[in-house]
A protein has these predicted regions:
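Histidine-dependent nucleotide/RNA phosphoesterase domain, centered on the 2H-phosphoesterase fold
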Residues: 1-199
């Protein structure tokens, strides 16, 4: 496993990147903690703090310096595009190591794809800047590697971990994200939120 932060395309700055997230509720956070603690003290693989666990629906091209008018336009566009979309059920598997971290993943679904598409349409409606790539599917990152990590150590730690199970996404959050490569974490400030269905 290689460093996530060495392989990621650098942001123009490390703070203020606008994202739309879905957030776990307390029950899901408890289930994620059960598998996250299996990674305690793995060198080069700090666990994401439970309060910052999230599903990325889309990273946007804009940063939080777009001003109040820009933020209002973005929120209005998101409200329009999300109108009528229903909550989305996801079925999360067991934690698994990847090339740059450990994730808990769920298969994509028409409902998930509709959420991602709606958010990206809204972002494109208020900015000509090209959007970053969409996420490969619904997932929660439990840990991001900050240095090379022996995959065998991670596989051994996760042996016997069971699927996390079902969760229903009932809301979305527009957030201003800070990446902290020195800590191996992301955190954010919430700017707006929507319950599903909107309207």
């Amino acid at each position: 496993m290689d460093s996530f932060f060495a392989s990621m395309t650098p942001w123009p700055r490390n703070d203020g990147s606008l994202h739309v997230y879905a957030l776990p509720d307390e029950a899901l956070r408890d289930r994620l903690e059960t598998v996250s603690v299996l990674l305690d003290d793995v060198a080069g693989l700090p666990r994401m703090p439970l309060s910052w666990l999230h599903f990325t629906v889309s990273r946007l091209a804009q940063f939080d310096d777009i001003g109040q008018a820009g933020l209002t336009a973005l929120c209005d566009a998101l409200t329009r595009e999300l109108a009528g979309l229903s909550p989305v059920a996801v079925e999360l598997g067991a934690p698994a190591p990847g090339p740059v971290g450990v994730t808990v993943e769920a298969p994509a679904s028409p409902g998930w794809d509709a959420l991602v598409a709606a958010v990206r349409r809204a972002a494109a409606a208020v900015s000509d800047d090209p959007l970053p790539p969409a996420p490969h599917g619904p997932h929660v990152s439990l840990a991001y590697a900050t240095a090379p990590v022996d995959d065998a150590v991670v596989v051994e730690r996760l042996a016997g971990a069971t699927p996390v199970g079902g969760f229903t996404i009932t809301g979305l959050h527009l957030v201003s994200v800070t990446v902290r490569p020195e800590l191996g974490t992301f955190d954010w400030t919430e700017l707006a939120s929507w319950d599903l269905p909107v309207g």
